[in-house]
Design a protein with these regions (language model features):
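Substrate-binding/catalytic lobe of Class I Rossmann-like enzymes that use SAM or dcSAM, i.e.
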Residues: 153-155, 159-201
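The AdoMet/dcAdoMet-binding core of the Class I SAM-like
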Residues: 19-150, 159-167, 174, 186
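A residue-level signal for beta-strand positions that form part of recognition/binding surfaces
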Residues: 1, 88, 190
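A broad, structure-centric signal for solvent-exposed, well-ordered loop/edge residues
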Residues: 9-11, 107, 200
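Membrane-interface segments at or immediately adjacent to transmembrane helices
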Residues: 1-17
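A short, flexible beta-alpha/helix-coil linker loop
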Residues: 7-11, 117-121, 154-156
Length: 201
């Protein structure tokens, strides 16, 4: 189990690292429903690497870039949670928005957002990763049929519902289609933005 300032970030079963994680991380595989021939994905936020392990296991030929702000998190993920860098997975120590702004070399078929900061009051989305300008940067770095999946901690009607609604409305200013998928085992909702105008389900 990995905690930041008392907030649980990652959990897994040592006997089977593909089990025991939060359900919402499985939802990060949904972008491939829209883009089943995806070749390159970007994950913002590493934590204990639940998303990275799943992608490397189920989609071994997909190239994955992970952006993590804190080098200490990357060190712990490698040493204690079995996260590996190899020919299909590269970890970049960088701010997520800065990475998108500097990226001129590649387009991604999917971007998965799970980048949180934390303090004594809990976890929160960094403001600069939740603006219209950020989503425009992300859309520019997506392929024509690219998809953005964003983990938002909150619920529909009660706890942090205002954050969920605000994120949904902001994504809709950039992405023609936005869907929401609540996790059953936690207060997480994954918002999925589809870049293509014909990207409906």
């Amino acid at each position: 189990m990995l905690r930041f300032n008392g907030s649980m970030e990652t959990r897994l079963l040592i006997a089977n690292p593909l089990l025991g994680h939060f359900e919402y991380t499985d939802y990060f595989q949904m972008p491939l429903l829209w883009n089943p021939k995806a070749k390159r994905v970007l994950v913002m936020g590493l934590g204990g690497g639940s998303t990275q392990r799943a992608f490397q296991h189920y989609f071994p030929t997909v190239h994955m870039d992970t952006v993590e702000l804190d080098p200490a998190v990357a060190k712990v993920a490698k040493e204690w949670f079995g996260v590996k860098e190899n020919k299909t997975h590269k970890i970049h120590i960088s701010d997520g928005r800065g990475y998108l702004r500097r990226n001129k070399e590649r387009k991604y078929d999917a971007i998965m957002m799970d980048a949180y900061s934390s303090n004594t009051y809990g976890s929160f989305i960094p403001y600069h990763l939740a603006t219209k300008e950020f989503f425009q940067l992300a859309a520019e770095d997506l392929t024509v049929n690219g998809v953005l999946a964003y983990n938002v901690i909150g619920t529909y009607n009660e706890w942090r519902a205002d954050i969920v609604g605000s994120m949904y409305r902001t994504m809709k200013t950039v992405f023609p289609h936005v869907y929401h998928f609540p996790a059953a085992d936690s207060r997480n909702i994954v918002l999925v933005g589809v870049k293509a105008k014909t990207g409906g389900l």
